[in-house]
Amino acid sequence: IDALLITHTHSDHVSGLDDLRAFFFPDRVELPVHATERHGQDIVTRFPYLFEKKPDSPSYFVPPMEMREIAAGQQLQIGDIAIDVLHQDHGNTSSLGFLFNGCFGYSTDVVAMPDDVFDRLADVDLWIVEALRETPHQSHSHFQQTFEWIERVRPVRAVLTHLGLEANYETLAAICPANTEPGVDGLVFELE
């Protein structure tokens, strides 16, 4: 893991941060965590021991994470990957989407996006995009809306994510557009 990109700080997205300590503690290297100012502050408040060393901490303890502020509209570079940070409306809050090397988009926990975000995502090779459930929701995209977004973006391939408990794989797969499939645990893909 070279870095973490935080879309937002709802518990289903950040509660596992503590589990990453095991990967970084032995080598005492810091994992960069990229988040908006507000979401970064929330994470540091919830998990202070991941970012700050207390005076009474053992001498061998090195906080495993470093918070780095990002904002929608910004571009950052992690290794050889250029990442465009995208604004998303998540109902009563905002979330971030990401576009990697101009060919892979990631949009979850989103109910609306500005036109310029759709323009940035146009014709990507792969778009992982939220489709919570069949009926509309105040902060998440539903199946029909996501299908309309896919038609607008025209990705080579779309994978639905953040599926709700009532989303049945076979039923959803049967109504997906030709280039679209529901995501599954363990999904692996390669981009050139």
Whereabouts are the PLM-identified features?
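Binuclear metal-ion centers of metallo-dependent hydrolases, dominated by the metallo-beta-lactamase
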Residues: 114-126, 131-192
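Binuclear metal-dependent hydrolase catalytic cores
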Residues: 1-107, 173-192
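Short beta->alpha connector loops
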Residues: 88-92, 110-113, 164-166
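Ser/Thr-centric signal marking residues that sit
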Residues: 7, 107-108, 129, 161
